[in-house]
Amino acid sequence: MVGFLFYRSRRRGPKIIAHFSSRGLNPVLLLWGVVFMLATSVVLEPLLSLLPEVPNAYGRGAWAIVTVVVMAPLFEEVIFRGVLLESTRAKYGVMAAWLVSSAVFGIVHVHPTVAVNAFAIGLVLGFVYMRTDSLWSTIILHAVNNGIAYLALVTGHGNAMLIDLVGSRTLYVLIYIGALAVFAVSGYMMLLALRRLKAEDKNRAAA
């Protein structure tokens, strides 16, 4: 399916293929993206704890790090944000592109726990891509996310619960409330920004 979308995109012209603009590298937005992804992971933890544990299939060594932290973010962002999101946005609009690209990104990760987390992370990455019009931003965020996940897995904490890591239920509740607040506020701001992007696309099409 992805190959078909790439083919269709090429036929329609390069304007809807992955955008790599250095102007989209906004440090504040990147920091927001990292914080939002971490908060999302904390908020989803009760749900993810009900799903099967994630197997450590990454391996170790330099090649594993390059594959997980460099190659995977690069190729996956080109495919899911650069091709799938852009193609869907051109035909069905901002919201459909945002949701569809995130859903497919989650589905292709297959494992239920990884798929749910990937869908949520995909929503953040999809928004950042449309907000910055640059894959560099999403590649960096994707690499940070994969790097954290890889480090957790190779150190034996890939399936550890936050409450076990902090060692205090009170501290866990405080962290969870903070993460939930960040998730709610950031999610609301993201939806408002997506509505503006939708309006901009509509005005551009009408011009």
Predicted regions and their residues:
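Transmembrane helix-loop-helix hairpins at the membrane interface
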Residues: 45, 62-206
